[in-house]
Amino acid sequence: MKALRRSYTSTSSGNSSSSSSLPSSSSSSLPSSSSSSPPSSNSNSYSNSNSSSSSSSWIHLRSVLFVANLSSPSSVTSSDRRRKSPWSRRKRKWALTPHQWRSLFTPEGKLRDGGVGFLKKVRSRGVDPSIRAEVWLFLLGVYDLNSTSEEREAVKTQKRKEYEKLQRRCQMLLKCGNGSTDNLEELPSDEANSQCVRFVDDYKITGPMTSQDVVSALNTDSSDTDSCEDNEDVLLLSSFAHSDEKKPEEDNSNNNSEENSSLLVAAASEVQVEVAVHEDFSTWQRIIRLDALRADSEWANYSPYSTAITESKARRLAESVGLKDYDHLESCRLYHAARLVAILEAYAMYDPEIGYCQGMSDLLSPILAVISEDHEAFWCFVGFMKKARHNFRLDEAGIQRQLSIVSKIIKNKDSQLYKHLENLQAEDCSFVYRMVLVMFRRELSFEQTLCLWEVMWADQAAIRAGVGKSPWSRIRQQAPPTDDLLLYAIAALVLRRKLIIQKYSSMDEIVEECNSMAGQLNVWKLLDDAHHLVVTLHDKIETLSQSQSI
């Protein structure tokens, strides 16, 4: 499976194959009424006979098309028609416009109705490109739906500080090079103990630090940290020093000594853990840089800064994050690559359990194309990864669980297809690995990706907030948000199942077919197909999953 991850995340998407489509029930595919209208009174008998024959032919053709449509896999029952998804053709409208977006706020800058109307509009329409940078901050949880303008400004300031602190840690590691901890052993014991105390405190307050931070803290100017953090460090160090001074006067000196020893042992243990984290971080740094330099340039047409970046600005940023061998990149691509490095390293520091894995750059790249401020892009990525992070676990438990669900859906939706996959030893559905891992980023165009993701985010947020009272909403509310994406993958797969059954006789051919879907998928049709799968199969799949987990 790890080999599949490497293969699927590095393979370029093809564009040579055209997708199969289901028969349409739209009246536009049928002859107009005028073409079959009766002849005028002054027509001769021959024209009357010819027109009558033509009319009968059209009626027959309409009947055939109607019957064919009813027998199509895409046909739905009357019960299904009553359960319209937010993306049905009838409901689809223009994307949320800037004017509509502004009208959703009260004079205090608060979304009306707790954001209910906002979520409904976004999940059924999508978002105009000019306001995506603002809207995504709400969709991805950077700003609370009930926040005021003043509260959001405070959050923005705090989030910027937290991101800058993560950046400083990354810069420390970059300057330290190989991350040796020899200097730590050379420190006087008292000084080393003090640094351990600072390390433990910082760990508790802001998250994991590397062992090199313990060493670098000695030489770090106090201006590099917030004054409140300095005060906390001074208080802790002062408290630790005074505990030694009071020993002769206190009866519980032995207890204090034991407590101090325990503290140092705990701190040393934390340092050892962070040494291992630092070794991982060095590996992540190398992979991040390689992936950043190889990032595709499709985003450039959507980025607001793509044509405004000078060569000197791009090179300065690239050097600040340690990029090398970038002479082949134009300025806008180099700037984008440097931003990828900075934010992905900060995330690896923020979430060391996940760190970095190939494919994460695919998820971040669209966010960077939309949001120009690094600290805002970082926290949007954090919000995105809250749902996607289990896809990148080293044990692959998350991805295996999702592939298992894909397999169950196929088995219950199309037994003929499943039997064919069994014959090819592909029933584990690893051929949709890439779709699940990077959320259709490789199969959809860049604009389609942006549209799909923002609608998906709004849909998930709306369901969690209880928006909508259709049976579809109630069913989806019980499923983990990331499972929805699997349904999209299955919808795309089901649409092409006849090609797979009839043409392919090997796993490699199926993988190639999945990879060739780039640019051939209709986002709104994909969402509609996913809706029908959820309505018809969710309860059954949930029951099967629960019975197997017991």
From Swiss-Prot:
Record has Nucleus as a keyword: yes
Record gene name: RABGAP22
Biological process according to GO: defense response
Entry's induction text: Induced by infection with the soil-born fungal pathogen Verticillium longisporum.
Role summary: Involved in defense response against fungal and bacterial pathogens. Acts as a negative regulator of jasmonate (JA) responses during infection by the soil-born fungal pathogen Verticillium longisporum. Involved in abscisic acid-dependent stomata closure in response to infection by V.longisporum and Pseudomonas syringae. May be a downstream component of brassinosteroid-mediated signaling.
Disulphide bonds in the chain: none
Organism encoding this protein: Arabidopsis thaliana
UniProtKB keywords: GTPase activation, Nucleus, Peroxisome, Plant defense
Phenotype upon loss of function: No visible phenotype under normal growth conditions, but mutant plants exhibit increased susceptibility to the soil-born fungal pathogen Verticillium longisporum.
Tissue: Expressed in root meristems, vascular tissues, guard cells, trichomes, styles and receptacles.
Claim: Transit peptide is one of the keywords in the record: no
GO MF annotation: an example: GTPase activator activity
Domain Rab-GAP TBC: from-to ranges: 126-460
Ranges of compositional bias, category Low complexity: 7-49
Ranges for region Disordered: 1-49
Oligomeric form and interacting partners: Interacts with AGT1 in peroxisome under biotic stress conditions.
Subcellular location: Nucleus; Peroxisome
A GO-annotated cellular component: nucleus
Signal peptide: none
Protein name in UniProt: Rab GTPase-activating protein 22
